Amino acid sequence: GANLPDQDRVFNNYGKFFMEMSRRSKEGIPTISVVFGNATAGGAYVPGMSDYSILQKNAAKVFLAGPPLVKMATNEDANDEELGGAQMHSSISGVSDFLAKDEKDALEITKNLIKKIKQPADNKYKSDASSPKFVKDEIIGIIPSNLKKRFDIRELVKRFVDSSEFIEFKENYGRTMFCCWTKINGYPIGIIANNGVIFIESARKATHFIQLANKSNTPLLFIHNTTGFM
């Protein structure tokens, strides 16, 4: 790459790229980043600034500097997976919204996202309703009599949404908050439901999801079973 003192001339228009991403996001034009390999230095900002980020497991790496530079600067030993691997960004930093198993899975996730983006819940976008695959009466057996006891909110959602299908957002990050896109009676909606004690990461996840729902004009359903805050 270019010498550091010369980067103001080599990458003099790079900031404009980030500005355009922010501007388009504000105008409701989303950006989807799909990372199959290394996104380093300036490229590391792109997934973080995108509305939706998909990282491939055991392949995607997102960091400003790799292990050699970290070793030189701090004398610390770290591998690339710890610094910016897909698993780390999906469970710890929250940069990744979706963790794909492989390239095919990443592209499938991308296709599903494109289908649901910019679909306001009016008659124009209403699809045929379909019944849940699970029996609704089972809801009574899922919710415990002790309201302070945690239960898997996904099992509840599966019993009232169309076809019992949903697209979960940041599945491995802030796991005590469940966020998903789905349909009820043919109408697209988003669901936010806490899945236990609400931690900081859980709150950040919900905030990000609400912002995305506002941009796509998607109504939200909130399901509460808060057992505590941390």
Placement of each model-derived feature along the sequence:
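Gly-rich Lys/Arg/Thr-decorated short loops/hinges at beta-loop-alpha junctions or inter-strand turns
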Residues: 1-5, 71, 134-141, 152, ...
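Short, exposed beta-strand "edge-strand" segments with a Pro/Gly-rich flavor and a Y/T-containing core
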Residues: 72-77, 94-101, 142-151, 194-198
